[in-house]
């Protein structure tokens, strides 16, 4: 939709379309029962109201015939609104059980609503047509692009957008600060609070002005600062409204197949990035990579884990060939076999923990990490492997400050005639 602009951006209002695809289906009456088939003799009269998608597909207006799917979606959307209201009341009443119930229910309804698009866009559903799925996505793109164009005409900078969200820079005062550092003065705190309120007012105003029946825009959250190295769906920001938390999307801190040392490193680097402390960020990144390269990091912070499938035979043995074409090449399979050999037990589908001890071998040498044993029961770890993996992850961030992954591992930057 709109590629993310690399760098640091202060005071970002994040606007989100409420149940975007279901809203489009309701607003434009999209259904197999309302699609106008151009091959049929009977067509709508010239003065009949119709919905025409950007693709050219036509759907009967609600006044002519209400679609079955839009009817169902309206009921589901009403149910979700009820549960959201229940969540709000539960928060006010400090009722955790009611809050969990309504939150689970609204999420379940959301998943059910979104599944309608998946069915429409599939080829196996009997009552569908390719016009349905393509019309929904075309209207979604149209809505996003139209709002971005209007915002930019008004002089607002859109720094990023995806399927159903828009990140736009708020028109706060030019001297506004976006980062409150420890020991900030009363004047700085007041400056920051004024900027925050200006962002909230801006976000609420934009949401109200650009909402319509088929595309309800909500001011989802406000960020005091937003950072990305320029890759799609990879960004981090400091949320200050309606709650206070760090927002991380697309980076390795969100993945379950990484190791804790990497996650902790990235989180601290995000703190430096959002505070606009580029020099400290680079120095911290260098120190973390060099520490792991020189094997100065405790192995417990380098544990990797993966799920391992297998078929349990009648005799109690495990057959891995049913799930893996070449099981001996899979680290998790070799770890599972090592656990079985040690008499520690293995259940198909469970996660196994391990350490890479020598990545230069093919396949690389791994050892099971066994909690309770000294040093996890391993002989050591491959510092170069972990340093390179860490550098590859955080190098996406440090590149914005002039340092590549290779330079982080080397510990210095290469220079050329063009560097001077």
Explain the meaning of each model-derived region.
Residues 41, 54-61:
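Conserved, carboxylate-rich catalytic/transport cores that coordinate ions
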Residues 119-134, 138:
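Gly-rich Lys/Arg/Thr-decorated short loops/hinges at beta-loop-alpha junctions or inter-strand turns
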Residues 47-50, 58, 71:
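Intrinsic-disorder/low-complexity peptide segments enriched for small residues
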Residues 56, 64-125:
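Active-site cores of enzymes that catalyze phosphoryl transfer or operate on phosphate-rich substrates
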Residues 1-38, 42-47, 91-97, 101-110, ...:
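DNA-dependent DNA polymerase catalytic subunits
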Residues 48, 53, 62-65:
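Intein modules and their embedded homing endonuclease domains
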